[in-house]
Every structure is written in C-alpha cells, then in structure tokens.
C-alpha cells in the first residue's frame, strides 16, 4: 500500500487509521494516532461538515495532522469507495448511537469480508447492545457522567456537578485508542480481525470506581467533597493560602508528624485516635478530622503559596499551586518541556496550544499539519485506493463525495 504524502515519524509510522465521528470522543482517539505518526483519515459528511468546525480555536488542536475525506459512506458508490478504503486500513473507529453502522448495512462481518485483519472500534454512549430503552440513545460527556455514577460523586455537598472540560469524551477516546492498539497487537499474531465495543458510560463507571467499591462491597457511599477537599481524608484536596489556592496530599508517617508540629497538633500524635505509624487521617472516622482541617486551614491562610511550597518541600508533602491558564506558558517546567507549542494552520496563521504527549524518546511525535479544510484530501485519498479523476468527478456529481473547492 502506498501511503498519503506526510512525513515519517513516531512509533506508529506506516499505520493507516480511519475514523468517522464528530465533536470530541471518537475524533480524540484518531487524534492520538495522528500525533504518534499514523496516517489518519477523517471522514466527514458531504453536505454537513463536522460540527466541531464552528469552534474558533479548538479544532486547530483536535484536527491537526489529519487527512480530510468527505464521502457518503452509506450510499451506493460512496459505500463502495469506503469499503475499498477499508481494504488498506489497519484500524477503523466509528462513533455513533449504538449499532448505527450495522443498522445501515455496514456490519463487522461486511468489513471483515473486505479486510479480515481489520480492527474495528465502535464508540457510543451505551454500547452496541443492551436494552432498547438505552442502546440507541445519543450521548455526550454529561450523559455518560450522569449514567455512570461518576457525576453524582463530583461537585459539593449541596449539589453534584459534572467534571469539565468534557472528561467522559477524552477518557472514552483514549480508551478507544488503547483498546485498538491492544487488538492490533493480537491481530498481528493471529491474522484475525477484532471488533471493540466501547460504551462511554462503562468507561466512566471504571474511572469512578475508587469510592464505588466501598458501596458495592459494604453499602457505604462516600459523601461528596466540601469546598474541593477530599471526601475521605483530611489534609488532602484544595486549600486557600493568603494569596491563592494550592492542592496538597498529607500522606505518610513523617509527613503527618512534621505537619502536626507546625499546625499545633503534635500532642495528638500517638493517641488511640492517631496512633504511631498513621499514614492518613480519615476525615469522618477519626474524631480529630474536623480539628485537623480547622488548624490546617488557619495555618495555610496565614502563609503565602511560596512559603507553603517551601515548607512542604522540606517536609516532603506533595503540593502544587493551582495555576491559572495565563500562568501556564511562563511556568519554568512548561518552558523546559515545551508543553505549550505553536504550529501553522493551513491558511498560514500561527496557532498555539498543548504539545504532543507523551514524549517518546526514540520515535517522537510531531505536528506536521494544521486542520485540513472540508474535503481537502478527498481526491488524494480516492486516487490512493485506485480511483481515477473521472471516477472521483462522478462521485462528486452524484453528491457522494466533496473535494476541496
């Protein structure tokens, strides 16, 4: 197979990934592949572009490094072109409502007839099967959080709150990426393709597991946090200093001992409630939990963030300032690791945003292209799989494909 024009880089160079999906979750999976060197083809509707394009800046990050194909994959010759593309594809990712592709005749079995080694990742809110009530429902970030038990655990004591920005979308997209790579590893061993059913609510169920396990195995439900503090453990979570906010984790025997000396609670060490060797102070079960919070709040409020960070570094207590977005760019760690970078958009502008992560030492990722326009690479992709200029024009004339104007 000849690949589309692009630089060769990253651990996934030579891999062809195709995705069909809008907004965040499914495309985020494709984005990870693209930043790690795979050739990634983004399928868009012919008549209506991906709704993400209405955003002014985010698409330049979320659709960089992609090849844009505008094709009606469910109808007539458009479907034929899509299936021909699948013959040269390693991984196909689709994000839709339940078994939408199967309902329209593109089943796993049809895809495997054209490519027995194909890895297929289906990403939906509620999965490919289940009850009629849920399976075909639309889902976004907040829907998956609400249905999974994740949302109810977040917020404050007075009200639950979703975790933003769009946590379920990103977790689900990354799950699709890792699952597809796991499947590809097995396919290369057996020669037999795989189909993956990723339900967003199940991803968030797994991500929300920490406190749920106490309920499933004892009936105890953890309360929601209060003012950003850990619902279980004192000295953990969000705290206010004299000039801003920090997060901290008071964990460890010596850390607790030394911190208690600073905040005037050394006399509690070695008591039945806080015996020697205590590594965590339970906010509820320990009768001194509220007192620890009161003393810690007072001590932190009397010190600046810089003073707290310096002292906690001496005590080996993990803490960090809560950075504002304007502070990120100039932070020395960000600068040293080039965590924020710039790249050129297709129309020649400069765009600034997060760099590629993680950092591969021997085969690093690369930003080689900004977001392509709607249908920008349709002709090149169709030619790559054997279509002539006349074939392409016929698809366009029938409204089954769109090429760049």
Swiss-Prot record:
GO terms for cellular component: cytoplasm. It is found in: Cytoplasm. Pathway: Amine and polyamine metabolism; carnitine metabolism. Catalyzes the reversible transfer of the CoA moiety from gamma-butyrobetainyl-CoA to L-carnitine to generate L-carnitinyl-CoA and gamma-butyrobetaine. Is also able to catalyze the reversible transfer of the CoA moiety from gamma-butyrobetainyl-CoA or L-carnitinyl-CoA to crotonobetaine to generate crotonobetainyl-CoA. This is L-carnitine CoA-transferase. CoA binds at residues 97, 104. It is an enzyme of class 2 (transferase). Homodimer. Its EC number is 2.8.3.21. The active site is at 169 (nucleophile). InterPro entries: CoA-transferase_III, CoA-Trfase_CaiB, CoA-Trfase_fam_III, CoA-Trfase_III_dom3_sf, CoA-Trfase_III_dom_1_sf. Keywords: Cytoplasm, Transferase. Belongs to the CoA-transferase III family. CaiB subfamily. The keyword Amino-acid biosynthesis does not apply. The keyword Transferase applies. One of its GO terms (biological process) is carnitine metabolic process. GO terms for molecular function: L-carnitine CoA-transferase activity. Transmembrane segments: none annotated.
